[in-house]
């Protein structure tokens, strides 16, 4: 742009812009290229100075650091000398090389793609190796409870004792089995002897005595079984309740400590840790830890108690037989240890990949407007899917180990049965044992080993908890280099506020090869105001970060009042500083709450609510925020939304300023504090800041030089050093100096106004809009007619419809479809694994039939004990042992396929659900994301948590459920075949168990629904804090965040406590009733044996079948919590997937535009709009704007007047309540949305970049597939955005990682990359929402010229507070309260001397 003092009065269309630009574009580009190349690549300052007259030659200067004695005084001879030196130095080479033919980026498309793919493959392999090397080993079991209170430990120990007691009940049952077996065998022997010898009075009496004895023994043993059942009920109820409650408490403490640990870390830690990863860890990993430290631990001890008690009882009854069988234990332990170690290793690695995906998801969802504007949902979805694919691959490997481990374990267990009968037959034939002892030992081993089948999934949960806890505890135990939680450090009683830098050198830890500050030395005297100006990336914001001690210098010292700030208490230091950042962050609370955050750590922190409110109001008045706050629906108690999204940029900035000054800090740091304000607000707020600066040390970073010209000293920075310093007037005295050049670039002179154009004078009601091109008479007539009939506006009716629809959606969320429908759909969704599921289902059914098969073998073996001949007895039992061995082989085979198959399918389903849910989330319209329940934290939390819960049921757990059902059905069938009447009695009791389990399912489902919402809300708090960690740190809000988060966790804990009493009672009842059913079958069976209705073999076959069936009926409902969580999570996922947004970018409907035929004529006709989340606030009021094709139109006005909303309407983020938006005369609602948005490029006020390379971020703007974009196209876009030379100066060039949210780049660098991203798609319509707000003056000038050039041949609509950037627009619209108050060219509006004229007056730098 011209540096002339005045502005031309002619309308400045694109042709004029181009003609004006052609004069200086070559020199300007050279200036910028030289500036970036030397400031970043070489580190030597290379500012440019251009004389005021147009076309003057560019003169490079090298000033270096200037002493305070020579402030602003630089001789022209030194400039010339340094100029000659630089021209002849090798430092010119990077610039010339950037355009040489041999430049590495000047390759053919084929070579470029080939080399890029090769490099990406190498990087991927290296990252995989690094990931494998960085996988943390699982923590020990006891470490999971490191945060438990002593009373909780006592309760847990009591619970474990009760769990072991409950586990011993089943082995005790085998003791009764053994005694009854002895009685049955003796009775059978007597009955056989009598039948062979004939019935005599003596034998008849003996037979009757045997019957009476058997009947008595059966009655007593049935009572014993019922007593065991009651004991089982009480013990199970108590231990399940204790461990459920303590598990929730333990999880709560881990969540609290993890968040506390995250918030205490130094800022450099967050270069690799995104807020999404924090949310994922808190939801997924903490959920896994909770699963593995609650009732599942008690179940492991119960099943282990059953196992141990069974073996101990076996040793007591027959040491020889038990000793032979105990040989299986080492094999079981070895297999189990290997399996669990492998599962923990691969499980931890898989969770790391999922956490990375969660971090990406948080970035993407937090910038959903940018994603949808560029239509890159698929590309970012694919990147998310890549992380998930890696987790699937790792999870599949773990599945193989799990399958092998379990198959070998069960083979050993079942093979032990064969050993038991083979060796037992020898002992009985030798008279060393009787049948009762053998059966007692056999049943003890059988029940004990049977418990191992149930222990596996519970133990797997504990193993996963150990793996998940590794990463959590690593963060909790990490001692940061800069610890905000430390109480160490000196706390001075008083503070003057003098800040000094002594030879400070600094580079960011993630980019050690790029120096930021190079021996920076200066002193900021107490009570004075200082300003830092200079190019983007010159180190200005780094100075602020070092003062706040976000980082420590690599060398050198930063001092406060002569004391090294590293020796000061960190919280005390930050509490003395008020900071307003370039991109202000507000928290999801009220306006009042946000401002009160500034009182933390001050003397007002514990003041009364009334006193605090008065301080808040005073600060808001000083920050020019009070008036707009009072216009909000609830005033100071209005919720600002996530990250303050319900406020405009300027409104957020003013609230942030109020927050910074409310505590009256001694030091004030303003990093572009007024960058987002309109000129009118800026002037008022700047006056307030000037007033607030009096008596305190103030350091201001500014690109708008109008805000710092009254500073006591101004520092011009470049290349990490001070180029010159002095007061505003002193620096201007050096006409060729860097500061003078910056000022010249920002001059906005006033010329004599021509005859003022009349603004429409026929406005009677200020709330009625009078705009260019208003509604047609017919439209007005229709509106009046409709209002006459309804008494309400079209906008009000439309808003009512929206509100009703939202209420209906919320009400529908509590409805959960049938489980069968959900499960069927989940299986269909994972259809790629249908053969795996089929094989795994068949294998699980076969594994479930093993136990009924054992019942048949058991009955046959028991009848063999009635054989009196020892040799024949050994032969018969050997044959039974052989059948057991064959069954063991078959069981091992099917268990491998069951376990490995379901585990793999579970990981695959997890991946499918995560990808589909993420894709569906990105498809939602912006209105959906505006709702509080769909905040970034909540959505990211659901994305991390819900698929994990579905996998919890559809992994190995589903195999166990299928196996249990097969055992239940198979046992009933076997029982009916061998003894229908007795089996029917037992089967008739099973529905009692089932109904109890069903009631429990309902109770737990309702609990899980409510728990999900409560945990999602708390996860949002954690994600919000992690996403704004610099703001949290600067406000010393760490304790406050922890307190709020802890309060949020109390609600789910209380809910869990109440519901656990009911649900665990029902589970315990199902366990206790099993023994009562067995007692009933036992007693009735004994009576029927006495009556000769059943043989001993038939009785035991039926009994064991029913025993196994009833046990499995009870065990099926062990998985009720898993099923409940899976149900509610699956329902929620499907609701999201099935949701059809009103504005759907994936829809194929609508007219598809041909890019070649799109002209770019944009028109807004009579638009009314209110945000659905704030229906009481009118944002746009009958707005009508016409933008002819190829014109450059600017929108200006106060913050909150509707400018950004207009841009959002053009992007079709929302649909108007009334009126319409058209492109080339076609209502955009009739156009295909993806096709329409492909014609538009958006550059937002706060640029959004994603974790990845610079190349990746620029390519996100391309309309065509990424692989089809040539390097020449990328280069051209970057050159137009004045970022090319900076990129090629980096060690990795376009492949440089930008960090999460672009954290590795300065604000100006991010903005220029965002502009390159917008230009690479060659749009027909260019939307610029404060596109140059984050740029320094030099960069702004060149980028603005690039944007002017880019505007050639396309429609451009720009929002700007810096009027210097839009003064040559074809038309300028001045907004006020959602309507156009003035319109015209720059000179026409100046002539009107209205609102626009006042803005120009405020920005005029020519009046010194």
UniProtKB/Swiss-Prot annotation:
Domain of life per record: Eukaryota
Ranges of compositional bias, category Polar residues: 79-88
GO biological-process terms attached to the record: oligopeptide export from mitochondrion
Location of the region described as Disordered in the Swiss-Prot/TrEMBL record: 79-102
Gene disruption: observed consequences: Causes higher susceptibility to itraconazole (ITC) and rhodamine 6G (R-6G). Causes further increase in susceptibility toward fluconazole and itraconazole, when AFR1 and MDR1 are also deleted.
Compartment list: Cell membrane
Domain ABC transmembrane type-1 stretches: 157-464, 838-1125
Residue span, ABC transporter domain: 499-744, 1162-1402
Catalytic activity: itraconazole(in) + ATP + H2O = itraconazole(out) + ADP + phosphate + H(+); voriconazole(in) + ATP + H2O = voriconazole(out) + ADP + phosphate + H(+); fluconazole(in) + ATP + H2O = fluconazole(out) + ADP + phosphate + H(+)
One GO cellular component term: mitochondrial inner membrane
Alphabetical keyword list: ATP-binding, Cell membrane, Glycoprotein, Membrane, Nucleotide-binding, Repeat, Transmembrane, Transmembrane helix, Transport
InterPro entries tied to this protein: AAA+_ATPase, ABC1_TM_dom, ABC1_TM_sf, ABC_transporter-like_ATP-bd, ABC_transporter-like_CS, P-loop_NTPase, Type_1_exporter
Transmembrane segments: 147-167, 223-243, 296-316, 321-341, 408-428, 436-456, 838-858, 882-902, 952-972, 981-999, 1072-1092, 1099-1119
MF GO annotations: ABC-type oligopeptide transporter activity; ATP binding; ATP hydrolysis activity
Gene3D superfamilies in UniProt: ABC transporter type 1, transmembrane domain, P-loop containing nucleotide triphosphate hydrolases
Membrane topology value: Multi-pass membrane protein
Residues the record lists as binding ATP: 534-541, 1197-1204
Signal sequence residues: none
Glycosylation site list: 244, 606, 934, 1127, 1182, 1404
Function per UniProt: Pleiotropic ABC efflux transporter that confers resistance to structurally and functionally unrelated compounds including azoles such as fluconazole (FLC), itraconazole (ITC), posaconazole (POS), and voriconazole (VRC).
Family note: Belongs to the ABC transporter superfamily. ABCB family. Multidrug resistance exporter (TC 3.A.1.201) subfamily.
Protein name per the record: ABC multidrug transporter MDR1
Species the sequence originates in: Cryptococcus neoformans var. grubii serotype A (strain H99 / ATCC 208821 / CBS 10515 / FGSC 9487) (Filobasidiella neoformans var. grubii)
């Amino acid at each position: 742009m011209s540096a002339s003092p005045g502005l031309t009065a002619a309308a400045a269309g694109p042709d004029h812009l181009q003609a004006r630009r052609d004069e200086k574009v070559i020199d300007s580009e050279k200036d910028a290229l030289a500036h970036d190349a030397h400031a970043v690549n070489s580190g030597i300052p290379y500012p440019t100075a251009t004389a005021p007259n147009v076309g003057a030659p560019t003169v490079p200067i090298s000033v270096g650091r200037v002493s305070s004695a020579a402030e602003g005084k630089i001789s022209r001879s030194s400039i010339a000398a340094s100029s000659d030196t630089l021209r002849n130095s090798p430092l010119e080479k990077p610039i010339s090389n950037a355009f040489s033919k041999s430049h590495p980026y000047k390759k053919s498309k084929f070579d470029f793609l080939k080399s890029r793919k090769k490099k990406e493959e190498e990087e991927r392999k290296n990252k995989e190796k690094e990931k494998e090397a960085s996988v943390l080993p699982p923590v020990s079991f006891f470490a999971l409870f490191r945060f438990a209170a002593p009373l909780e430990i006592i309760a847990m120990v009591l619970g474990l004792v009760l769990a072991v007691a409950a586990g011993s009940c089943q082995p005790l049952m085998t003791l009764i089995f053994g005694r009854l077996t002895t009685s049955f065998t003796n009775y059978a022997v007597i009955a056989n002897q009598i039948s062979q010898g004939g019935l005599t009075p003596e034998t008849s009496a003996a037979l009757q005595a045997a019957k009476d004895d058997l009947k008595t023994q059966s009655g007593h043993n049935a009572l014993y079984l019922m007593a065991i059942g009651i004991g089982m009920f009480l013990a199970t109820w108590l231990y399940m309740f204790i461990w459920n409650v303590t598990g929730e408490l333990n999880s709560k403490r881990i969540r609290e400590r993890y968040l506390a640990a995250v918030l205490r870390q130094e800022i450099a830690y967050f270069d690799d840790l995104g807020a999404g990863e924090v949310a994922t860890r808190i939801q997924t990993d903490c959920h896994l830890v909770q699963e593995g430290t609650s009732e599942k631990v008690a179940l492991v001890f119960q099943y282990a108690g059953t196992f141990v008690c069974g073996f101990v009882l076996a040793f007591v009854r027959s040491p020889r037989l038990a000793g032979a069988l105990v040989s299986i234990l080492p094999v079981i332990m070895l297999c189990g240890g290997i399996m669990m170690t492998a599962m923990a290793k691969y499980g931890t690695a898989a969770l790391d990949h999922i956490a990375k995906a969660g971090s990406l998801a948080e970035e993407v969802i937090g910038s959903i407007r940018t994603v949808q504007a560029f239509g890159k949902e698929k590309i970012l979805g694919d990147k998310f899917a890549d992380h998930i694919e890696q987790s699937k691959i790792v999870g599949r490997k773990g599945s193989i180990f799990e399958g092998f481990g379990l198959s070998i374990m069960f083979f050993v267990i079942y093979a032990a049965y064969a050993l038991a009968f083979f060796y037992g037959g020898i002992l009985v034939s030798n008279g060393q044992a009787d049948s009762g002892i053998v059966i007692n030992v056999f049943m003890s081993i059988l029940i004990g080993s049977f418990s191992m089948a149930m222990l596996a999934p519970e133990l797997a949960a504990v193993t996963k908890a150990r793996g998940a806890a590794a990463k959590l505890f690593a963060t909790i135990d990490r001692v940061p280099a800069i610890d905000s939680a430390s109480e160490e450090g000196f706390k001075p009683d008083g503070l003057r506020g003098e800040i000094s830098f002594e030879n400070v050198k600094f580079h960011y830890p993630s980019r050690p090869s790029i120096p930021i500050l190079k021996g920076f030395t200066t002193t900021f005297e107490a009570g004075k105001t200082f300003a830092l100006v200079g190019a983007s990336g010159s180190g200005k914001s780094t100075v602020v970060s070092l003062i706040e001690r976000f980082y420590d210098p690599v060398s050198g010292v930063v001092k406060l009042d002569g004391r090294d700030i590293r020796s000061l208490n960190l919280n005390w230091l930050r509490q003395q500083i008020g900071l307003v950042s370039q991109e202000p962050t507000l928290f999801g609370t009220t306006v009042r709450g946000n401002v009160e955050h500034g009182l933390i750590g001050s003397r007002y922190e514990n003041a009364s609510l009334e006193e605090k409110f008065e301080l808040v109001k005073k600060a808001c008045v000083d920050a020019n925020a009070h008036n707009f706050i009072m216009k909000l629906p609830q005033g100071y108690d209005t919720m600002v939304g996530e990250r303050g999204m319900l406020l405009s940029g300027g409104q957020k900035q003013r609230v942030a300023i109020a927050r910074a000054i409310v505590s009256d800090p001694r030091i004030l740091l303003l990093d572009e504090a007024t960058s987002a304000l309109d000129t009118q607000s800026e002037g008022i707020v700047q006056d307030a800041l000037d007033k607030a600066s009096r008596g305190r040390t103030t350091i201001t970073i500014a690109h708008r030089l109008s805000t710092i010209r009254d500073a006591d000293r101004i520092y011009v920075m470049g290349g990490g050093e001070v180029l010159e310093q002095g007061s505003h007037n002193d620096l201007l005295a050096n006409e060729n100096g860097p500061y003078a050049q910056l000022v010249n670039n920002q001059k906005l002179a006033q010329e004599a106004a021509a005859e003022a154009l009349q603004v429409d004078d026929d406005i009677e009601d200020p709330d009625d809009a009078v705009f260019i091109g208003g509604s047609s008479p017919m439209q007005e007539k229709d509106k009046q007619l409709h209002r006459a009939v309804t008494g309400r506006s079209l906008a009000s009716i439309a808003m009512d419809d929206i509100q009703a629809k939202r209420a209906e959606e919320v009400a529908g969320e509590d409805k959960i479809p049938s489980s069968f429908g959900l499960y069927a759909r989940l299986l269909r969704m994972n259809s790629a694994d249908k053969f795996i599921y089929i094989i795994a289902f068949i294998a699980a059914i076969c594994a479930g039939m093993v136990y009924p098969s054992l019942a048949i073998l058991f009955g046959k073996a028991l009848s063999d004990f009635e054989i009196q001949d020892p040799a024949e007895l050994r032969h018969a039992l050997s044959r039974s042992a052989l059948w057991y061995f064959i069954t063991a082989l078959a069981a091992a085979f099917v268990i491998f396929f069951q376990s490995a198959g379901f585990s793999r399918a579970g990981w695959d389903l997890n991946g499918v659900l995560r990808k589909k849910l993420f894709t569906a989330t990105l498809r939602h319209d912006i209105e959906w994301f505006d709702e509080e329940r769909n905040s970034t934290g909540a959505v990211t939390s659901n994305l991390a948590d819900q698929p994990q819960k579905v996998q919890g049921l559809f992994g190995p757990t589903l195999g166990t459920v299928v196996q249990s059902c097969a055992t239940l059905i198979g046992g009933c069938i076997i029982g009916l075949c061998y003894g229908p009447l007795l089996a029917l009695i037992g089967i008739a009791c099973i529905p009692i168990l089932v109904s109890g389990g069903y009631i429990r399912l309902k109770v737990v489902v309702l609990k899980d629904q409510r728990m999900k919402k409560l945990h999602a809300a708390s996860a949002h708090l954690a994600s919000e804090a992690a996403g704004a960690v610099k703001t949290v740190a600067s406000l010393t809000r760490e304790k406050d965040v922890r307190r709020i988060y802890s309060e949020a966790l109390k609600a789910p804990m209380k809910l869990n406590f109440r519901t656990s009493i009911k649900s665990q009672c029902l589970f315990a009842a199902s366990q206790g009733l099993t023994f009562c059913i067995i007692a009933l079958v036992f007693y009735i069976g004994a009576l029927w044996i006495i009556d000769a209705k059943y043989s001993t073999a038939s009785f035991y076959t039926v009994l064991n079948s029913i025993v196994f069936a009833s046990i499995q009926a009870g065990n099926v409902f062990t998985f009720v919590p898993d099923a409940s969580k899976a149900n509610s999570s699956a329902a929620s996922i499907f609701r999201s997937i099935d949701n059809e947004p009103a504005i759907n970018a994936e829809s194929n409907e609508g007219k598809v535009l041909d890019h070649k035929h799109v002209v770019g004529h944009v028109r807004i006709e009579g638009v009314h709009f209110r945000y659905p989340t704030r229906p009481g606030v009118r944002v746009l009021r009958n707005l009508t704007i016409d933008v002819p094709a190829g014109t450059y139109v600017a929108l200006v006005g106060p913050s909150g007047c509707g400018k950004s909303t207009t841009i959002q309407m053009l992007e079709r983020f929302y649909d108007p309540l009334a009126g319409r938006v058209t492109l080339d005369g076609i209502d955009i609602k009739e156009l295909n949305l993806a096709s329409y948005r492909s014609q538009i490029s958006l550059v937002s006020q706060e640029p959004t970049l994603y974790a990845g390379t610079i190349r990746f971020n620029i390519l996100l703007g391309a309309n065509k597939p990424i692989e089809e974009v040539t390097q020449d196209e990328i280069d051209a876009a970057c050159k137009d955005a004045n970022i090319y030379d900076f990129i090629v100066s980096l060690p990795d060039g376009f492949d440089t990682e930008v960090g999460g949210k672009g954290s590795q780049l300065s604000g100006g660098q991010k903005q220029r990359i965002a502009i390159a991203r917008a230009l690479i798609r060659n749009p027909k319509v260019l939307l610029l929402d404060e596109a140059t707000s984050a740029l320094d003056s030099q960069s702004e000038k060149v980028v603005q010229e690039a944007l002017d050039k880019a505007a050639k041949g396309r429609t451009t609509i720009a929002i700007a507070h810096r009027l210097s950037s839009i003064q040559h627009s074809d038309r300028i619209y001045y907004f006020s309260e959602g309507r156009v108050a003035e319109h015209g060219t720059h000179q026409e509006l100046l002539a009107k001397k209205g609102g626009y004229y006042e803005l120009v007056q405020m920005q005029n730098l020519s009046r010194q």
